[in-house]
């Protein structure tokens, strides 16, 4: 089974070019075609993977294994098709290329342009004599026609067709690229004989020509760039430049003898500098003519299509050169000491370096000090939390004793008892935030006095605050308001038939937040919720369900606390009936 479909080959090639560009000095387009040819092998996936490892190692070196593994992952997930919607279709590309056929067909074969160039201004009614093949001013970039022509110096590789020669990369865009300079004058430049808005610019550079040149070619009015097959860094125009930079030299040819034997045919080599790390070198010839012959030669270097050659510009520096090169001069001036200077530092020598050991000891000491500070902070935080818990527990006990004492000695101190009750509730909430168990704390004596004041206010007790200390347990920050909600959280559902029971359970599962469902009878259900919010959500939404509109809902109060109290000295008689919350059907309390 093929690793990819042929209709997806264009997208895969685009992905491979983008992946190869930063990790290889070879031409990304040609190398991607080579990689796709390897992936097309009719073998198992593991065999193709091993083939890619062996064939791409010469070009990618240490990046070979990560690159191949990544490509197979991409092929398995087909992630290279993610950008397919943004790419033009093949038909559109073919159509655009056919529009921009060779430049020679764009130049008129007759003297149809003589009238326009012999007159200072075009006559009224004259049409544009430029051929229809000239691209639109805002059209796509135009490649030089020779960019896709097969090389006449090397035969095409079997199985690859007429692929571009890597030693002869695509020729740059023509100077009249519509994206850079419009071949036609833009409209509305100046007023002509026919008035404003006419598509003529009478001071165009294309009209500045010699009247005697009847065969004036407007496309040659601009200087042509260097269209050679080698890479240039603008140093080839310098007649004093005699240095070349060669990259991506294979290991078997990376020595002074082979390099000199190949490049000596172009002229006398004065100096060869090798860069073992990047397999590149700098060549210095005795004359600019010899260097130019080597640079412009169409012959592949060492018969390898992926070796690149540049003009070396000393002013910009050689970004791949290390600080110390293996400098190999001519045999008359060679020095073996320069060879030793290019050797990399042995990692084993670092173990014998005292400064290296001192640096390791310093880093280790800093790390140990950092761990000590972290442990000390943790211990201090635990001690602080323990003190907070002990203080809160002590305050609770003192508050209970004080409330009990006031209750026994002063029967008429209702206001003071209400204040202590509120403070006691705040202390219980604070203890709950600190993680202290408050279940064993006796109920507040507020229920025994026959009155219910959940929101009683007053001055805070000494040593307490209106906010809660500590981080809490995810209930907001330390300044968040707290309240005790004693409203009912249990609902009684009446008129539940077997048909409505399933719909009721489905809606209950949708709302969630319930704790228990009991069935006192076949037509009645008691539902306990975790909080008042969930209960109200169920209460308000059950009427909107079509099958549950006939149900009757009622709030079930919490267990009433009945406490018999004696009459106060004020003559007030408070009974436990004041604590009961009456339940009315369908009414929120």
Swiss-Prot record:
Q: Which UniProt keywords apply?
A: Nucleus, Phosphoprotein, RNA-binding
Cellular compartments annotated: Nucleus
Q: List residues modified as Phosphoserine.
A: 330, 334
Broad class of where this protein is predominantly found: nucleus
Name the GO cellular-component terms: chromatin; Mei2 nuclear dot complex; MTREC complex; nuclear body; nucleus
The entry lists its GO molecular-function terms as: RNA binding
Domain RRM: from-to ranges:
242-314
Give all Phosphothreonine modified positions.
332
So which domain of life are we looking at?
Eukaryota
Q: Name one GO biological process term.
A: nuclear polyadenylation-dependent CUT catabolic process
Q: Where is the composition biased (Polar residues)?
A: 566-579
Pfam families per the UniProt record, alphabetical:
PWI, RRM_1
Q: Where is the composition biased (Low complexity)?
A: 330-340
Instruction: Write out the ranges of the annotated region (Disordered).
Output: 322-348, 443-465, 566-589
Q: What is this protein called?
A: Uncharacterized RNA-binding protein C902.04
